[in-house]
């Protein structure tokens, strides 16, 4: 076991996400004081969330946070013994919180902890511009999402800025064309483009 990275506490909380929907948060504390936190939306049939949080919290106590595969295996085995569908996203929240705590415990950024020391590419942001399908409540589009990906951006920040420029330009075009600029569940515009 890596010194100081033993999981000494896992706390679960019920929250609401940015849309006011139920979510769960896991917070993991390590022996060396490092912490990690993650929030995941709950599915509709999440069962007894409090019970799932308690069961999954206890199953990883005293495990080595730097052994992500081992922790995930324990979580999956525990979840399958009680019914994975009823775990309501808390399994994912615990797994993510363990990763973040391990990275903090080792004093490195999460991307470096997960990606290793070899130079790699940082993630490229993707942004939904127009929502359709089940996300576009007020339109008849068959596609669920029309997204932009800022390929070639020099940094994540530059990529996000490019996405926002396109988003704002699209909003102006929709307004000029007389379309609504309300947004759907995933943040994309939901104009009726029939």
Language-model region placement:
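Short, Gly/Pro- and small/polar-rich lid/capping loops
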Residues: 1-22
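Conserved phosphate/anionic-ligand binding catalytic regions in large, soluble enzymes, centered on
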Residues: 15-26, 83-103, 124-141, 185-189
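Glycine-centered tight beta-turn/hairpin loop motif at sheet-sheet or coil-to-beta transitions
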Residues: 31-33
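Metal- or metallocofactor-binding catalytic centers and their adjacent structured scaffolds
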Residues: 38-108, 160
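Mobile "lid/hinge" segments at catalytic clefts and subdomain interfaces of large enzymes
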Residues: 49, 120-184
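Flexible, glycine/charged-enriched surface loops at secondary-structure junctions
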Residues: 65-72, 86, 110-113, 171-188
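Glycine/threonine-rich beta-strand-loop-alpha-helix active-site module
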Residues: 108-126
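Short glycine/threonine-rich loop-to-helix capping motif typified by GTGT followed
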Residues: 190-194
């Amino acid at each position: 076991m890596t010194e100081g990275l033993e999981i000494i506490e896992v706390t679960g909380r019920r929250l609401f996400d940015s849309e006011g929907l139920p979510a769960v948060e896991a917070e993991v504390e390590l022996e060396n004081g490092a912490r990690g936190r993650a929030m995941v939306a709950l599915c509709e049939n999440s069962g007894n969330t409090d019970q799932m949080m308690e069961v999954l919290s206890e199953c990883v106590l005293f495990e080595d946070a730097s052994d992500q595969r081992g922790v995930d295996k324990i979580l999956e085995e525990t979840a399958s013994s009680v019914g994975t569908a009823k775990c309501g996203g808390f399994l994912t929240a615990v797994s993510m919180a363990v990763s973040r705590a391990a990275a903090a415990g080792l004093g490195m950024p999460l991307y470096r902890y997960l990606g290793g020391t070899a130079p790699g590419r940082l993630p490229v942001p993707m942004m939904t511009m127009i929502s359709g399908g089940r996300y576009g409540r007020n339109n008849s589009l068959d596609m669920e999402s029309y997204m932009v990906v800022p390929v070639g951006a020099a940094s994540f920040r530059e990529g996000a800025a490019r996405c926002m420029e396109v988003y704002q330009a699209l909003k102006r075009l929709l307004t000029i064309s007389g379309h609504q600029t309300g947004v759907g569940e995933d943040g994309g515009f939901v104009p009726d483009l029939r």
